[in-house]
Amino acid sequence: LVPVDAKAVEEKVAELSPKNFPIVGIGARVKGAISYCGTDSAAMEKLVKEELKRLSDSKKVANYCYFYTNSTAISPSEKQLFTPVSRDEIESVRKLAEPAETYSVSSYSEYAKEHEIDIMRRDNYGEIFLNPRLLANMVPIKDDPDRVFAFCLGSLPQLDMYLSGGQLDSCVYDDWYGWGYFAMRTLAEKVVEKRDPSKKEELLKPLIATPKNVDSFRKDWARWLR
């Protein structure tokens, strides 16, 4: 369901449930669904916290966070809807980062081009992308010796280029394949085996990709896109 608000589909779920049309919520809890699968928020927060500490080498780094928005007219309360990452995850990472500044942009490359001088003035800083769509156009991130690290929350196939080239140091993302596997297994139990799901809820650990294990990242996307 991410990034759809669960409330937007609950009316339809309520309509279908009496008609023996079972629904599993993935990425968001849905009222009326027979079960739910998502990411363990505590595990996500722990992993991101460890990564930010590792990437900064435990030094004080000025973090700059980027939200994704596809419209300059969108309100701050709505800007986080345009993401394959949940709002709870975004807010959790933003708090952990304790950003010096936050920006809402449609493309990091466009922002970097327009604010090249501002970026050059930064010292000892980290960049945190709170949506992989910020890097979807595959424009390389300009090298900067003052940039300590670049981190992304969420995943798209395009990030392979950034990870392989060392432009992105770390990416933490949801196990979408695991979500789908749980959902299909649950539906098979309900529809084929005619029994209630063995699990009402399944929380999976987040995945992590770095330049060192980028092959694993590619394999994840290869099986997701089959």
Role assignments for model-derived ranges:
Residues 1-18, 92, 100-162:
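Hydrophobic alpha-helical
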Residues 6-43, 156-164, 168:
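Flexible loop/hinge segments that line or gate small-molecule binding clefts
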Residues 14-21, 50-57, 139-140, 164, ...:
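Sec-exported extracytoplasmic/periplasmic mature domains
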Residues 24, 149-151, 209:
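Structural detector of well-ordered beta-strand residues that form the stable sheet scaffold
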Residues 31-39, 69-72, 124-125, 170-173:
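Second-shell loop/turn segments in exported
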Residues 36-63, 76-77, 155-160, 174-195:
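Hydrophobic alpha-helical segments within soluble ligand-binding/sensing domains
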Residues 44-51, 72-100, 179, 224:
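Short, solvent-exposed amphipathic alpha-helices that sit
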Residues 175-226:
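Hinge/cleft segment of the Venus flytrap/periplasmic-binding protein
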